[in-house]
Amino acid sequence: MMSVRPKTSQTYGHQDHRFCPTCGGPLEDGHESGFLVCKSCGRISYLDPKLAGAAMIEINDKLLLVRRGIQPAYGKWSFPSGYVNRGEQIERAVEREVVEETGLVVTADWLVGLYSEPDKTVVLAVYSATVTGGKLIAGDETLETDTFPYTQLPDLAFNGDAKIVEDWLGGRAKR
């Protein structure tokens, strides 16, 4: 089962915070906490992590993966995933991201785990999910979708992806 969309160029880049989100004043080093502080209003700019969600989806005894159409890891295989919007329930965010990236409607069933790495800005909540509808496509942020046998996965996009697969398979075996 495979779906492909046309190639499009994507750009990506992180910008350092340079201005205060409260007053627009310049941020500078020097606060005792190690974080940036606004020179104008004194607000400390904490660089809190961003929450993302991902789905582990089984289709015909295979794992659904998406080939990423955005950075980071453009062109690499990973799980349908994306950021949780402010005020959004994590499970609903996972379900929304799956629809956006694959066209499939899913229900987030159980939490596989929470994953983070030192010096990374993202905390990833991974759920096992069941397909309840939709049609498999490659969404706007996805180059293609495909299913793979668990023992024959392609090279995965991120360092922690293999551990996530291992945890998911272990969790499935216990259910």
Identify the role of each PLM range.
Residues 26, 30, 41-44:
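Cys/His-rich metal-chelating microdomains
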Residues 137-168:
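NUDIX/MutT-family hydrolases
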Residues 28-30, 104-113:
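A short coil-to-beta-strand element that immediately follows conserved catalytic motifs
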